[in-house]
């Protein structure tokens, strides 16, 4: 079908003479054996014919290089084929010269010294390149080969007689104009028989159909990931090599793809050209708009064969399947941690580099990802575009709505193999598993405290800086995190949509309900290795462990008093502030903390949901029940370091320690 150039065919096809130099007297070039296609012609080739074309063209080029050496310049079509791009833009459609006189009219030769006719092909070509013999008469630009000049000359001579009446853009062919006009009309005449999706051109349909057939001929040698296009694998391999040739002139950030740079630049310009027709929300990326649109339709066409879970996008299914296979192709060279997706891997690397290029203009908080900045900004605007159809509750992001919807279905497909606890999201399971491994990669430089999650470290660091950027507009109270502010706002509205089916107690957050329900089940999976005491919650275990170490990392800047918990420090600081923003509606008594108010309100309601299983005594607080149970168990966890005496309560130990201090005095 296509001519393959044999090595012995390479040679001089015309003798060289400086005085009577005729047009294109040079070596047999790649152009002599190349076959060119227009875009329209290319669409009629089936995939096997296209693969054959690529193989033949690349082999021809390799044969030329093997004889001509490195001095042979890479033709444009070869560069395109190697990068997985389609070759319809090559010379044939644009300038198909058949008359030598026409070719000579656009070429002006520069006088060069005389060479013998038996000069070697390599020497002759290197002379051509060094001397740049071909000059454009239009702009005087010089080129080392006639082919390069002809390719350049197309920009001067190509006619574009077909004009779009909508926008004035010109095209070389009526076919190109027809394709372009479909952007204005929205016409998509090519339909996929598999899924019914429509496309503007046959080429787009052919590309789309590969997603149904699963055809992926280009495989990454590093991680085994396969791609439909060679250009995609070139972009992907930069993840492994770290190559980032595209740099932003605004902030200096570099990218592996030019398209990523263009999208990134919208962060600086604020451009969001893609608008949702349903809710009016705008996006900087078309892919984000498409993903967002599926929240309105609730369409999930991609289904996991292992567990039946459905996804909106094909790549989400691919990533999900790694949960079943355990595959983590992206490994951090700094700490050895593996990731299922490149995006998580790149995000993790910023932890080591400390890069947070995205800053909120309202509160100056910085973020590693732009999408995290946009989500955060909703805290200031209060915008909530995603509504639950079950209960009408709204959320700032689609992912939060997705998480919330599982509270109605009760779906928890991800189970911990260590303790059997189940989770609604795979990310929650991964976080939970760190409790069993005890891994704490993230250390606070101020107090050396370590954390299993990076976000917990960043929250903790606000204790040292004292930053409280999120202020309640009702009472003026400030918080170090937006989530704490959202929780606090519910104290003013009194909203408690989550109800315990066991005792009827209601909660403002679903997480609080989950914590509360563990009291009824009696499960205490977290055990102290020092005294074997067990706890319902991991945070209670960590708090308890500070009793053994006597660690109190949280210090009041006013009086120097130290505390085991940041919440205790916050409660203490209200003593210095002398503010009591929380008032009881029954009797008017005011309190410094919301927790004190809720405790007080039980006096009026008489609610005592926590009952002792031994004697039936009821308590208004779970902590009071725990203290009471020590009477039955005989447990005395508080030990005096001076004399070894043990106590049931921390307050009793403190009172006892005063005896030793008074004796010393």
From Swiss-Prot:
Gene Ontology terms: biological process: regulation of transcription by RNA polymerase II
InterPro entries assigned: KRAB (IPR001909), KRAB_dom_sf (IPR036051), Znf_C2H2_sf (IPR036236), Znf_C2H2_type (IPR013087)
GO molecular function, one term: DNA-binding transcription factor activity, RNA polymerase II-specific
Taxonomic source organism: Homo sapiens
Gene3D superfamilies (UniProt xref): 6.10.140.140, Classic Zinc Finger
Function: May be involved in transcriptional regulation.
Zinc finger (C2H2-type): 134-156, 162-184, 190-212, 218-240, 246-268, 274-296, 302-324, 330-352, 358-380, 386-408, 414-436, 442-464, 470-492, 498-520, 526-548, 554-576, 582-604, 610-632, 638-660
Organism phylogeny: Eukaryota, Metazoa, Chordata, Craniata, Vertebrata
Family that this chain belongs to: Belongs to the krueppel C2H2-type zinc-finger protein family.
Keywords: DNA-binding, Metal-binding, Nucleus, Repeat, Transcription, Transcription regulation, Zinc, Zinc-finger
All residue ranges annotated as the KRAB domain in the record: 28-100
Name assigned to this protein: Zinc finger protein 573
Highest taxon listed in the record's lineage: Eukaryota
Compartment(s) where it occurs, according to its Swiss-Prot or TrEMBL record: Nucleus
Gene Ontology CC terms, in alphabetical order: nucleus
């Amino acid at each position: 079908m296509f001519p393959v150039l044999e090595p012995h065919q390479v040679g001089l096809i015309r003798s060289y003479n400086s005085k009577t130099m005729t047009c294109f007297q040079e070596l047999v070039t790649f152009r002599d054996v190349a076959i060119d296609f227009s875009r329209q012609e290319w669409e009629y080739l089936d995939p096997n014919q296209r693969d054959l074309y690529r193989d033949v063209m690349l082999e021809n080029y390799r044969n030329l290089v093997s004889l001509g050496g490195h001095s042979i310049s890479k033709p444009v079509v070869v560069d395109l084929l190697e990068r997985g791009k389609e070759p319809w833009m090559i010379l044939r459609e644009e300038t198909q010269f058949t008359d030598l006189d026409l070719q000579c009219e656009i070429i002006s030769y520069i006088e060069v010294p005389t060479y013998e006719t038996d000069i070697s092909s390599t020497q002759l070509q290197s002379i051509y390149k060094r001397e740049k013999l071909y000059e454009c008469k239009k702009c005087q630009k010089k080129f080392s080969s006639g082919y390069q000049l002809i390719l350049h000359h197309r920009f001067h001579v190509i006619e574009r007689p077909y004009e779009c009446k909508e926008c004035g853009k010109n095209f070389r062919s009526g076919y190109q104009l027809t394709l372009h006009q479909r952007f204005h009309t929205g016409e998509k005449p090519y339909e996929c028989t598999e899924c019914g999706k429509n496309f503007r051109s046959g080429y787009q349909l052919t590309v789309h159909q590969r997603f149904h057939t699963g055809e992926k001929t280009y495989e990454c040698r590093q991680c085994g990931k396969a791609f439909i296009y060679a250009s995609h694998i070139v972009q992907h391999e930069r993840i492994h090599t770290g190559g980032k040739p595209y740099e932003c002139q605004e902030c200096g950030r570099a990218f592996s793809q030019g398209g990523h740079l263009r999208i990134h630049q919208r962060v600086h310009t604020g451009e969001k050209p893609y608008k949702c027709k349903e809710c009016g929300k705008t996006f900087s990326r078309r892919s984000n708009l498409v993903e967002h649109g599926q929240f309105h339709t609730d369409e999930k066409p991609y289904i996991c064969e292992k567990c039946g879970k459905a996804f909106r996008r094909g790549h989400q299914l691919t990533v999900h399947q790694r949960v079943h296979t355990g595959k983590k192709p992206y490994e951090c060279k700094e700490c050895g941690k593996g990731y299922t997706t490149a995006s998580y891997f790149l995000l993790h690397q910023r932890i080591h580099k400390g890069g947070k290029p995205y800053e909120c203009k309202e509160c100056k908080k910085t973020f590693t990802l732009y999408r995290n900045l946009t989500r955060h900004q909703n805290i200031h605007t209060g915008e909530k575009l995603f509504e639950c159809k079950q209960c009408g509750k709204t959320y700032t992001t689609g992912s939060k709505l997705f998480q919330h919807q599982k509270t109605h279905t009760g779906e928890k497909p991800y189970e911990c193999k260590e303790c059997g606890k189940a989770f609604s999201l795979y990310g929650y399971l991964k976080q939970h598993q760190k409790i069993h491994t005890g891994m704490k990669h993230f250390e606070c430089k101020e107090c050396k405290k370590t954390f299993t999650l990076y976000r917990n470290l960043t929250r903790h660091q606000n204790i040292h800086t004292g930053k409280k950027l999120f202020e309640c507009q009702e009472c003026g109270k400030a918080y170090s995190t937006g989530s704490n502010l959202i929780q606090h706002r519910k104290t003013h509205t009194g909203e408690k949509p989550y109800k315990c089916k066991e005792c009827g107690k209601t909660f403002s957050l679903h997480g609080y309900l989950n914590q509360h329900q563990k009291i009824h089940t009696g499960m205490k999976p977290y055990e102290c290795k020092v005294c074997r005491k067990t706890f319902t919650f991991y945070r209670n275990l960590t708090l308890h462990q500070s009793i053994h170490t006597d660690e109190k990392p949280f210090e009041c800047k006013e009086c120097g008093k130290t505390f085991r918990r940041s919440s205790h420090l916050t409660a203490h600081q209200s003593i210095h502030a002398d503010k009591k923003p929380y008032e009881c509606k029954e009797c008017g008594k005011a309190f410094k903390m919301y927790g004190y108010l809720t405790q007080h309100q039980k006096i009026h309601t008489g609610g005592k949901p926590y009952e002792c299983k031994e004697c039936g005594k009821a308590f208004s607080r779970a902590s009071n029940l725990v203290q009471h149970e020590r009477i039955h168990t005989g447990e005395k966890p508080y030990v005096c370091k001076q004399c070894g005496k043990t106590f049931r309560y921390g307050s009793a130990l403190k009172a006892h320690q005063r005896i030793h201090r008074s004796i010393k005095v």
